[in-house]
């Protein structure tokens, strides 16, 4: 793909992301999903737009994907409602680097002290090609990329 086609494609994706979820951005609580046990010690704590999961290791919690920054309060509520304390989250592992999966990473680290984890490829994209995270399409003007701990 040549650079001009890439730029046009990126702009189209960004514009689509900015408009497709306007109601979710304005009213995230409408998309709340009551947390539930999937199997054994694995729980669904996401909403109807972004999947997030929690694993109880017995020695602390591992969370997968932090979702959007603007809906962090829903994830915190879901952790409590699932019967856990967010302060027990030891690791927050991100499946990939798109803003709808990493948006609240820094909030969880700042509030609860958990370690932020992403693949080396994801960390490289955030550092070297941040435009691919689609951060400009994020509803929060304060959203930022995080620096992984591991």
Predicted regions span which residues?
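Intrinsically disordered, low-complexity segments enriched in polar/charged residues with Gly/Pro
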Residues: 21-24, 29-32, 39-42, 102, ...
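A short, structure-level motif marking secondary-structure boundaries and short turns
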Residues: 18, 59-61, 90
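A generic structural signal for short
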Residues: 22, 63-64, 93-94
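Residue-level detector of flexible, active-site-proximal loop/helix-junction positions
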Residues: 10, 17-20, 49-51, 70, ...
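Conserved beta-strand hairpin/beta-sheet module of binuclear metal-dependent hydrolase folds
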Residues: 28-82, 86
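Short N-terminal helix-initiation segments at or just after the protein's N-terminus
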Residues: 1-6, 33-39, 96
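Active-site HxH/HxHxD metal-binding segment of metal-dependent hydrolases
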Residues: 42, 70-73, 80-150
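Accessory terminal helices/loops
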Residues: 1-28
């Amino acid at each position: 793909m040549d650079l001009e086609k890439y730029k046009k494609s990126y702009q189209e994706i960004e514009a689509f992301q900015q408009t497709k979820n306007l109601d979710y951005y304005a009213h995230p609580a409408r998309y709340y999903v009551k947390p539930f046990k999937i199997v054994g010690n694995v729980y669904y704590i996401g909403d109807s737009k972004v999947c997030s999961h929690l694993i109880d290791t017995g020695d602390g919690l591992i969370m997968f994907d932090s979702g959007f920054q603007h809906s962090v309060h829903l994830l915190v509520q879901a952790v409590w409602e699932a019967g856990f304390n967010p302060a027990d989250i030891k690791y927050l592992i991100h499946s990939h680097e798109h803003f709808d999966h990493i948006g609240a990473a820094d909030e969880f680290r700042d509030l609860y002290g958990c370690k932020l984890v992403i693949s080396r490829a994801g960390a490289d994209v955030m550092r070297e090609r941040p435009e691919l995270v689609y951060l400009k399409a994020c509803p929060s003007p304060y959203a930022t990329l995080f620096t992984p701990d591991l």
